[in-house]
Amino acid sequence: PESTGTGRFGNWLENLNDWNLSRSRFWGTPLPIWRDDSQGEKCIGSVAELYSEIEKSVSAGIMKVNPLKERGFVVGDYSQDNYNKIDLHRPYVDDIILVNDEGKPMHRESDLIDVWFDSGSMPYAQLHYPFEGAINFNDDSAEIVKSENHISTEEEYRELLVNSSYKGTPLPPAFFPADFINEGVDQTRGWFFTLHAIATMVFDSVAFKNVISSGLVLDAKGNKMSKHVGNVIDPFQMIHQYGADPVRFYMMTNSEPWD
């Protein structure tokens, strides 16, 4: 509804503050930034780049071995078996020490990235874009595939444009931007925003065309249920007491379709 779209979400965007991406936690996605003592930085953009930088560190005598190579990781092999050989989370990634142009060691920034950045990156992460997931990513996939040298002949390029297929294989519809997404109204400052922010920064595009925004479950006094407040009802307890179908029917009949 307009009250959520141009209202709640629009007001959030109009009064937007800078997004602090770092989090001082252990579990999560490490920030791929290495710093030296002079505040020089290296931001790593792929596992292939990290592999290459570790090789430089080994050559400079900073690291003794390349742990990715030691585990048999093969750059360019995007199979699950290959990626199961390595773990780039803490504490393992913190043992990787890179080298700057002066031969000095560089240590990883200890913070993690906001988990909402992970959520907002979903359209790209699910396809491992822009690595092997470029072909059917978005409506401009033909240009992307051609620019990434996946297509070597004009015949293949024409096939992609005319038949939406690649080397005889039909391509699924474009994944980005999404036709619609669905989440609770509280995601105007969460998932809706992070999807929109990252898509704008990276592609100057919307991440979704339509939104179905559902309401929130309230308590007997009309307040939002919250684990922090302690006014929640355990659904499993209700299912155990009344059965799954009565609970499901109650939820359906007490929520208007437009809520």
Task: Set out the residue ranges of the language-model regions.
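Structured secondary-structure scaffolds
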Residues: P1-D259
